[in-house]
Regions:
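Conserved beta-alpha
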Residues: 72, 76-152, 156-157
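N-terminal nucleotide/polyanion-binding subdomain common to many enzyme families
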Residues: 1-90
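Structural motif
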Residues: 63, 159-160
Length: 161
């Protein structure tokens, strides 16, 4: 994405910029209706990326932001460069604050049953974001279930998942 700097981490571009720069770019993308994916990468996700081809494919064309100290440390030691961390929970909260101001809606997907609903209540109260839907992440891996989940999310009209 424009205006961001990256470091190459084993073939994966990782954002170097601070959180304000990241939020500015994401805000601009939302303003023009641009579709994008963001992953906040910690050491565990970095390990999966390095060892699992499916993870490598999933992270292709994704804006990858350092989440944890472990990844930041590895980049500093291996590549002799510094990156700014932006933990996923903090990014999610900031995106909800942004969405609350711009009237974008959010669909919360993942975790165990009940967690997304509790998060939705908290986020709506704290940020004013409109929650388009919630769904836990525990489901059957069959294709019909996955298609149903995708349809539910798509029909929600959410701008942010």
């Amino acid at each position: 994405m424009e205006c961001l700097s990256f470091v190459d981490f084993y073939g994966l571009p990782i954002v170097k910029n601070d959180r304000e720069a990241v939020l500015t770019v994401l805000r601009r993308a939302l303003d023009v209706g641009r579709t994008f994916r963001v992953t906040t990468m910690n050491a565990q996700i970095a390990y999966y990326y390095l060892t699992m081809p499916d993870y490598q494919a999933a992270l292709k064309d994704t804006l990858v932001i350092p989440d944890g100290v472990g990844l930041s440390w590895a980049i500093r030691k291996r590549l002799n460069t510094r990156v700014s961390r932006f933990p996923g929970v903090e990014l999610g909260l900031e995106l909800c604050r942004l969405a609350g101001k711009t009237e974008e809606s959010v669909f919360l997907f993942g975790s165990k049953p009940g967690v997304a609903e509790k998060a939705a209540t908290f986020l709506a109260q704290e940020t004013g974001v409109r929650i388009a839907g919630c769904r836990h992440g525990f489901h059957n891996p069959d294709e019909d279930t996955q298609l149903g989940i995708c349809q539910e999310i798509s029909e929600s009209g959410a701008s942010i998942l």
